[in-house]
C-alpha cells in the first residue's frame, strides 16, 4: 500500500526487476479497480503477484469503498510504505510543473540554440518559496497521507512497515534482499546492483516534460531520453567516454540506424548533442526545486497552516508511531 510522492513508482520498477507481477491501478473507481486486480492475478498464475493500493479516494462513495476492500483476504502479508512527511510534501510541490507555451521537442541542428531556448521556456514550476501558501494541504489526506485510512481495512494482516529512505540508491539493493526473504520472492541479481543505484522516476524533474528530445541532422535524427528503447540503438558510448547524466538521470542517445555514420559525422553530432546537454544542465541548475528547509521556513511563519499540516500528518502517523517509532524518529525534517 502506497501513495503519491513517496518514490513508489521507482519501487515498483525494482520489484518488477525481481520478477514480481504488479501494476499501478491509477485513478479508477471500485468496480474497474477490482477488474484490473482480478485480471492481473490470473494473467500469470506462475509468477509472484502483488496488488498495489493507492489513491483510493477515487471511490464514488463510502459503501463502494467498503465493498471493494471487503474482497481482500485477511491472511495475506501487507507492505505499507512511509516517508518523512516534509520530504513527501516537497516532492508533490516539485512535481507540479506546468506548461506555459506548448513547443515542439524537435530540435533542428541549424537552429539549435533558438529551438532549445523555446523548449526551455515552455515549462515552469508551479510552486516556489513565495507561493507555497497556494497549495491546499487537504490534498494530502486525499492522495498522499492515506496510510491510516487504508490500514483500517487490514487490521488482521501481517504488516511490514517500509521506510522509503531504505530504497535510496546506497541501500536499495540490500533492502530488496531483505524484502525477498520476508515475502518470499526472488532476490535481486548480484549483477543488477548498478540498476538499483539509478534514479528511476522523473516525477519532479523538468526532463519528464522536455523528453524525448529529437535532434534533427542532415542525414539522420537522434533522440535524447531517460528511457532505454529496445527498438533503437543507444549510441551514447560511441560519442562519450562517460555515462551521460542530467539531473541525476542516466541519459540514452538513440538512433534508428548507425550505418553510414563516419567519424566526421559522429564528431559533428557530438558537438550539437553536447550543446543540448549543456543547455539542459544550465537550465536545471538555475531552476532549482524546493527543499524541505523552504517548507519548514514557510510553516515557521504561518501558524494556522502549521496547525493544519500537523493535524493531517499526525493523524496519518498513529499506527506507525505505535509499531515503528524508530522509523518516525529517523525523519529529520518531521522532527524539526
Which residue ranges define each predicted feature?
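PAPS-dependent sulfotransferase catalytic domain
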Residues: 1-193, 197-245, 251
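Arginine residue identity/basic-tract feature
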Residues: 12, 17, 33, 90, ...
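Generic preference for hydrophobic/aromatic residues in regular secondary structure cores
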Residues: 20-23, 159, 313
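Generic alpha-helical secondary structure signal
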Residues: 38-42, 60, 127, 131, ...
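PAPS-dependent sulfotransferases, especially Golgi type II membrane carbohydrate sulfotransferases
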Residues: 185-336
Amino acid at each position: 500500500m502506497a501513495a503519491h510522492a513517496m518514490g513508489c513508482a521507482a519501487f515498483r520498477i525494482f520489484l518488477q526487476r525481481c520478477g514480481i507481477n504488479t501494476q499501478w491501478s491509477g485513478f479508477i473507481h471500485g468496480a474497474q479497480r477490482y477488474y484490473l486486480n482480478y485480471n492481473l492475478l490470473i494473467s500469470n498464475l506462475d509468477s509472484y503477484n502483488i496488488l498495489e493500493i493507492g489513491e483510493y479516494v477515487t471511490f464514488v462513495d463510502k459503501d463502494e469503498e467498503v465493498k471493494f476492500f471487503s474482497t481482500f483476504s485477511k491472511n495475506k502479508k501487507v507492505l505499507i510504505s512511509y516517508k518523512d512527511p516534509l520530504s513527501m510534501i516537497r516532492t508533490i510541490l516539485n512535481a507540479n510543473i506546468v506548461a506555459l507555451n506548448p513547443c515542439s521537442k524537435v530540435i533542428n541542428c541549424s537552429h539549435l540554440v533558438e529551438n532549445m531556448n523555446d523548449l526551455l521556456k515552455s515549462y515552469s514550476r508551479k510552486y516556489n518559496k513565495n507561493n507555497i501558501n497556494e497549495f491546499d494541504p487537504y490534498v494530502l489526506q486525499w492522495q498522499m497521507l492515506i496510510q491510516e485510512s487504508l490500514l483500517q481495512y487490514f487490521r488482521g494482516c501481517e504488516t511490514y512497515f517500509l521506510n522509503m529512505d531504505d530504497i535510496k540508491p546506497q541501500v536499495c539493493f540490500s533492502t530488496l534482499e531483505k524484502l525477498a526473504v520476508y515475502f518470499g520472492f526472488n532476490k535481486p541479481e548480484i549483477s543488477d546492483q548498478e540498476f538499483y543505484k539509478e534514479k528511476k522516476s522523473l516525477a519532479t524533474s523538468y526532463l519528464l516534460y522536455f523528453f524525448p528530445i529529437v535532434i534533427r541532422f542532415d542525414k539522420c535524427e537522434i533522440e535524447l531520453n531517460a528511457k532505454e528503447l529496445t527498438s533503437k540503438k543507444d549510441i551514447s558510448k560511441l560519442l562519450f567516454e562517460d555515462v551521460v547524466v542530467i539531473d541525476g538521470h542516466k541519459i540514452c542517445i538513440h538512433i534508428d540506424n548507425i550505418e553510414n555514420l563516419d567519424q566526421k559525422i559522429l564528431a559533428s553530432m557530438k558537438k550539437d548533442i553536447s550543446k543540448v546537454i549543456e543547455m539542459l544542465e544550465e537550465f536545471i541548475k538555475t531552476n532549482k526545486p524546493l527543499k524541505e528547509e523552504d517548507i519548514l521556513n514557510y510553516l515557521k511563519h504561518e501558524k494556522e497552516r502549521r496547525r493544519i499540516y500537523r493535524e493531517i500528518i499526525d493523524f496519518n502517523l498513529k499506527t506507525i508511531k505505535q509499531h515503528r517509532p524508530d522509523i518516525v524518529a529517523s525523519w529529520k525534517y518531521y522532527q524539526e
